[in-house]
Amino acid sequence: MYKLVLIRHGESQWNLENRFTGWHDVDLTDTGVAQAKTAGQLLKDAGFTFDQAYTSVLLRAIKTLNIALEEMGQHYLPVERHWRLNERHYGALTGLDKAETAAKHGEEQVKIWRRSFDIPPPAVEDDSEHFPGHDPRYNNVDADILPRGESLKLTIERVLPYWHDVIRPDIQAGKRVIIAAHGNSLRALVKYLDGMSDEEVLGLNIPTGVPLVYELDENLKPISKEYLGDADAIKAMMDAVAKQGQAK
């Protein structure tokens, strides 16, 4: 049996401001820092230790991982950062206020952009500040495969090769793994691990800064999964995520 821990980054500044964030690099809020510390303490209290950590190349996920590991006394852990674990790219919606966008375009349209499986948001142009090709951290990535805007389906197609090629072999080799990433890159992994349908995943909301613990069999099929922390508080956080696209 293997154990795998997934954690969405703590609250970011644009989470707080209810903006579409995607690949834009924003920092954690004070609440987000506190969530990361709490996550680390919960994992420590539950007796977790890790051999390998994975995260995206975005500050909010990197910082969440570092803070949690420091709380556990495992700040020395090997960490691999990769763009394939980044958040879904929100295209031309990046930076827009979700509630204002819903008021302008209608809640149903924003729900389609946020929660449909295979409909991407409007794409950014290559000369946009939000096109990843202008960011030096992606210099070694072919510009043709960098996203201009992604649906959840496209995000899954980006994330899963990294799971199969890198993370899965480490787990099967006996390494204890933690992944700190983002709402949609983690939805991609949860959908795959749980065998969720395209329709089922639309209702999946992942709270910020809460460790999700999987027990997996020898084929990496889930035996069990649970969030660490107060169940009522976690449900409230999930409900808040679901309501982000509503007009004020």
UniProtKB/Swiss-Prot annotation:
PROSITE patterns: PG_MUTASE
GO molecular function terms noted in the UniProt entry: phosphoglycerate mutase activity
Cystine connections: none
Active site residues according to the UniProt entry: 9 (tele-phosphohistidine intermediate), 87 (proton donor/acceptor)
Enzyme Commission number, as recorded: 5.4.2.11
CDD domains on file: HP_PGM_like (cd07067)
Catalytic activity: (2R)-2-phosphoglycerate = (2R)-3-phosphoglycerate
Keyword Transferase among record annotations: no
Key words, A-Z: Gluconeogenesis, Glycolysis, Isomerase
SMART domains, alphabetized: PGAM (SM00855)
Signal peptide (from-to): none
Record function comment: Catalyzes the interconversion of 2-phosphoglycerate and 3-phosphoglycerate.
Record's subunit section: Homodimer.
Family from the record: Belongs to the phosphoglycerate mutase family. BPG-dependent PGAM subfamily.
Name recorded for this polypeptide: 2,3-bisphosphoglycerate-dependent phosphoglycerate mutase
Gene: gpmA1
